[in-house]
Amino acid sequence: MKKVLAFVLALVMVLSMAACGNDANKQGDAEKEVTKIRLAHDYSPETANSIGMENFAKLVAEKSGGTIEIDIYSNGELSGRNSQTTFKLLQSGDIDMAIVPPPNTDAWQLFYQPFFFRDSDSAYAACQGEAGQMMLDKLRDSNNVVGLAYLPIAMRAFTNSKHPIQAPADMEGLSFRVLDVPTLVAWMKEFKASAVPMSMAELYMSLQNGTVDGQENPLDTIKNQAFYEVQEYLSITNHIWSFSLFAVNADFWDKLTTEQQDILKECAVEASKDIKELAPEVNDAAYDFLVNEKGMKVNTLTDEQWLEFQKAAKPVWKAMEATIGADVLKPWMDAVGVTWD
């Protein structure tokens, strides 16, 4: 009888310990609950932005101890490679994070001002200061997204089928496809050129059949879209700094813990730095391809020529000042060291 009682007591103890162990395992599982984040972008795998996002996902997993998992939807998988669609998906919360273009709204017209930024480095540096943070704050106010970082792409260049662009007068009478942005349309008018807003999907055919004489984009876009097949002249004008925004849906952001937010912010800044290092390599490779492999006729503006363009563009800045807001334009002029003179 004593042996039976001892056996029963031992069995009870074993079962109790097993139950405690199961409770501990459940508690451990709860502590390691994974937050999944859907991140979308429209860039192909070989681009700096795409590589940067892969590095971002790895860094987040490492710093969160595997408790934050980034699922990447690249190459326009969710948007049909339409950046405006990506932005709308982010605003609505159908995706959690994304690389998106700057909004085509009043204050953000600043970044479409021609010949405002001299180069990528000075533009990126200004974005890391108070002026850059001011714009990220405005992003949430009007778009329901939280801006985490600026992702540099490159300065933009012109192509056309007529002649090199070396002075403002060289643009007179030419028609250029531009983004449907008020500042760009005003600029073309000021330089006596024709602005023809159209989608990227329409552009190649329009260049081929002469609907427009030229277009402007970063060199990597010119390469990837094969515009060299239908354009003879490449002018390195460095007239506008192209960049993207790394952003997160505001409602989703507010549900995260402070620790999770800090991890994502930190990793976003690191991704931005990675992309800044990669972007010049991509740009240089595109230049080599377009000029040395495909034989486009290239000219690069000298400092003197660039300043001539900047002087001619300042009436556009002044015309857009009321739209952008003097409270936005002035801090940015100070940040990049430009004046009205």
Could you describe each region identified by the protein language model?
Residues 125-144, 150:
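Hinge/lid segment of periplasmic solute-binding proteins
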Residues 21-120, 140-141, 146-341:
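N-terminal secretory/targeting leader peptides
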Residues 1-9:
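Positively charged n-region of N-terminal signal peptides that target proteins for export
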Residues 16-19:
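C-terminal motif of bacterial Sec signal peptides marking the signal peptidase cleavage site
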Residues 9-10, 268:
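Enrichment for repetitive, rod-forming helical segments
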